[in-house]
């Protein structure tokens, strides 16, 4: 009977708890069996004196009753211990159960803060990259135009300078052309003079 009760209690507890707790229950059940055996021995010792005090005729019956009673008495006091043991067992089992469940919760919490840092890391690098990008862009834009502008005007000023002396050179030839045409006109005048001279020849011819 005791073994049946213990096995039933173990089955109920095992269904409620994990396999790890079953090992603990098995160890505790073995200890309970030892305690129950000791209780039975003590019960037999205590029950033997009463038959001696009873009448001799009832001694045989008392012996039989003792055997039966010992079984009943042994069962009765033995029942509470396993129940008590069962009540005591769950608390340690519960304590063991929640810690592992709490462990993953705590691990998940540190995991969350670990997640955002890597996200913040990629956000940080782009910021320094942005300032690096504009400086090179601004540098080439500012440098080439500055030297290019001063270089551009000097050559422009150079060609502008020569045309100025060229301009005076230009007008003189133009003036020469203007003066030259009147020169051929001058020979036209001598032609006219020749016409005037013709009468002189005429005078000679005459």
From Swiss-Prot:
Sequence repeats lie at residues 80-97, 98-115, 116-133, 134-152, 153-170, 171-189. Residues 1-13 form the signal peptide. Residues 103-112 have a biased composition (Low complexity). Keywords: Repeat, Secreted, Signal. Residues 80-189 are annotated as: 6 X 18 AA approximate tandem repeats. It is found in: Secreted. Residues 15-206 are annotated as: Disordered. It comes from the Eukaryota. It holds the Pfam family Pro-rich. Residues 55-71 have a biased composition (Acidic residues). One of its GO terms (cellular component) is extracellular region. Residues 113-174 have a biased composition (Pro residues). May protect teeth by binding to tannins. PANTHER family: BASIC SALIVARY PROLINE-RICH PROTEIN 1-RELATED, PROLINE-RICH PROTEIN. This is Acidic proline-rich protein PRP33. It comes from Rattus norvegicus (Rat).
